[in-house]
Amino acid sequence: MIYGIGTDIIKIARIEAALGRHGDRFAERVLGVEELEKYHRRKAKVAARGLRFLATRFAAKEAFSKAIGLGMHMPMTWRAAQILNAPSGQPIVVTSGKLAEFMQENGLTAQVSITDEVEYAVAFVIVEKK
């Protein structure tokens, strides 16, 4: 049964501006440990790839927060939800801490789809109740 649906679109230039103002502290605030490692690897190869990666993760977390009905309020925090990849490459939502407890206690699972184009990053999340 569908518990919630969330979507988000962000102009990549907004993320670029935030990085310009705050440097990598912005990425450190938004990304979990594994995401941050991947961000730095991509950024080291091509700066634009790092930027797009950060923008898609930002959009996915916003969409996820909407789908679970909490917005960015506890137990939902930027770093408690990571958007990682299954071995197939499919993006997956991995939660930790109080957010993982919330998901388990409520019998929730999430499916996420992300994409980016020159100017925008978009994410769509469906949360299901078992």
Swiss-Prot record:
Belongs to the P-Pant transferase superfamily. AcpS family. The keyword Transferase applies. It comes from the Bacteria. One of its GO terms (biological process) is fatty acid biosynthetic process. Its EC number is 2.7.8.7. It is found in: Cytoplasm. One of its GO terms (cellular component) is cytoplasm. This is Holo-[acyl-carrier-protein] synthase. It is an enzyme of class 2 (transferase). NCBIfam families: acpS, pantethn_trn. It catalyses: apo-[ACP] + CoA = holo-[ACP] + adenosine 3',5'-bisphosphate + H(+). The gene is acpS. Mg(2+) binds at residues 8, 62. GO terms for molecular function: holo-[acyl-carrier-protein] synthase activity; magnesium ion binding. Pfam families: ACPS. Its main location: cytoplasm. Keywords: Cytoplasm, Fatty acid biosynthesis, Fatty acid metabolism, Lipid biosynthesis, Lipid metabolism, Magnesium, Metal-binding, Transferase. Transfers the 4'-phosphopantetheine moiety from coenzyme A to a Ser of acyl-carrier-protein. Its cofactor is Mg(2+).
